[in-house]
Amino acid sequence: MNKKNSPKIGHNKKSFLNKPVEHIDITSFDARKLIESMSKMSFTSRDTAKAASIYNEMISDKNCSIFLTLAGSTSAAGCMKIYADLVKYNMVDAIVATGASIIDMDFFEALGFKHYQGSQFQDDTELRKNYIDRIYDTYIDEDQLQNCDRTIGEIADTLEPKAYTSREFIYELG
């Protein structure tokens, strides 16, 4: 997609924030045949199939610890349920993530707010006029983001004044 054929999205807040990002449910389909087929292809398709094969070996190895590392806003892009399912079904042993993934994205949606599909070509000045933030092609309602920040501040204000590790603070968030 380029700027010329990018979707024409409205000029008011409601028209910009009209298509929520949907999180993938990896339990709703069987991707094995697709991944196996990719092993006979080229470029990154074959690499993806090889990575899946290695991952399967890791899951089968009782002496292997699997760390999932996340950077950026992949949970806002629709991967949040994937991460939850990987933990739920013991497919990862640990997650190392940036604060954006845990605080600004997961906690934001835990409060009932949503991320919305948008366009990376949208004029940021127009978005700013409507109090909308953009992460590449994903939109966030700035009013809701500020509500999230206030909620975190209110929780922080109830804590005993001392230094907290990231884990301790995230635990306090719930």
Task: Describe each region flagged by the PLM.
Residues 2-146, 150-164, 168-173:
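Metallocofactor- and cofactor-centric catalytic cores in central/energy metabolism, strongly enriched
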